[in-house]
Every structure is written in C-alpha cells, then in structure tokens.
C-alpha cells in the first residue's frame, strides 16, 4: 500500500468493471452462434429461478445453431418457455430431451439496436470506473488534508490514478469497437 490510497485496490476495482463489461457484451448476439447468448436466460426450476446453464448443457454444433441438452427430462418444457420468454428473439425446437435453437440472420435494425445496447453497457462501465477514480481522489485529498502524504506525493498519486482511469476507459472503448465491428459484420 502506498501512503494515502491503495492503488492496487483501485486497479482491481477498475479491472472488475472491465470484466463485467466483457461479460455483458459477450451475451450480445452477433452473426455467429455462441453459448453466451443464453447467459441472461433463467428457468423456473424446482421452485425458484435458475440460470439455464445450471439445468442444461449448451453447445454450438453449427455456426448458426445452438443445442441445449437438458439434464432432467421433466425440465424440457420449462427450458423452452424460459428461452421463448427471454426477449432474445429465439424459437427453440424441442427434440426429445434437448432443444435446437436456430439463430436467424440479424437485420440492420436489430444490429443497430444491439450496438446501442453495447454502448449502454460501455457507458455503465465507464461510470463505474469514474466512481472508482473519484473514491481514489477523495482518499488522496483526505490523506493530504490529514498530513499522511505531502502535496507532491498527492499530486503524483493523483496523476497515477488519472492515468490508470484513462487506460481502463481506453480498454472499454477498444472492446466496444471490436464488438461493434463484430455485430455490424454481415
């Protein structure tokens, strides 16, 4: 710990915001099938709501097809209902104890709407990063005021926090740009 604030803790929190952003955009559907598409789906199972991946195995047998193998045969209809009600625009086809989910082509309007959602996720992550920065700066001001660190040390640490913030936000922008290209690719 550097006197004043814990830079490593701030970095860990900023990295957490980046990880959350990666997870959010991974669930956005692009032209290719990905098991992450079904991450937001929850199923009414055994008296409570559960993530789909806790009641079934999700695979990608073809580029435009997902396969969901339900572990408990009695859950097949609940899984189908959960996928249909998830607002992902998917129509599963029941095939015994599994479901096949063909992924329709994305039209231009849907692609633009997905890009907008990705931008919303990015903004949410940037706000979280700025909150971490603010917490760090407040800690520095308090340490400076309490005489724990001098003005020069406070200035140096605040520049480090700002540089870390800028780099983390640049990483969010880079990931957003990649996802945008992936979504808009026909």
Curated annotation (Swiss-Prot):
Q: What does this protein do?
A: Responsible for the release of ribosomes from messenger RNA at the termination of protein biosynthesis. May increase the efficiency of translation by recycling ribosomes from one round of translation to another.
Q: Which Gene3D superfamilies match?
A: 3.30.1360.40, Ribosome-recycling factor
What domain of life?
Bacteria
UniProt lists the family membership as follows: Belongs to the RRF family.
Spell out the protein name for this chain: Ribosome-recycling factor
MF annotations from Gene Ontology: ribosomal large subunit binding
The family database entries (SUPFAM superfamilies) matched by this protein are listed as:
Ribosome recycling factor, RRF
Where this protein primarily resides, as one coarse class? cytoplasm
> What keywords does the record list, in alphabetical order?
Cytoplasm, Protein biosynthesis
Which GO biological process entries does UniProt record here? cytoplasmic translational termination
User: InterPro entries in the record, alphabetically?
Assistant: Ribosome_recyc_fac (IPR002661), Ribosome_recyc_fac_dom (IPR023584), RRF_sf (IPR036191)
Q: Where in the cell is it found?
A: Cytoplasm
One GO CC annotation, please? cytosol
Underlying gene: frr
């Amino acid at each position: 710990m550097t006197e004043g604030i814990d830079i490593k803790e701030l970095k860990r929190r900023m990295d957490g915001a980046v990880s959350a952003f990666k997870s959010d955009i991974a669930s956005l559907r692009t032209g290719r099938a990905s098991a992450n598409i079904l991450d937001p789906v929850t199923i009414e199972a055994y008296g409570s709501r559960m993530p789909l991946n806790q009641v079934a195995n999700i695979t990608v047998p073809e580029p435009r097809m997902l396969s969901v193998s339900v572990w408990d045969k009695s859950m097949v209809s609940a899984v189908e209902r959960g996928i249909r009600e998830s607002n992902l625009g998917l129509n599963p086809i029941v095939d015994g104890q599994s479901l096949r989910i063909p992924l329709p082509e994305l039209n231009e309007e849907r692609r633009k709407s997905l890009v907008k959602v990705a931008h919303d996720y990015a903004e949410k992550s940037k706000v979280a990063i700025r909150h971490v920065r603010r917490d760090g700066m407040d800690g520095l001001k308090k340490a400076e005021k309490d005489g724990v660190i001098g003005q020069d040390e406070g200035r140096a640490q605040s520049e480090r926090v700002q540089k870390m913030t800028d780099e983390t936000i640049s990483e969010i922008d880079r990931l957003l740009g990649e996802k945008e290209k992936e979504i808009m690719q026909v």
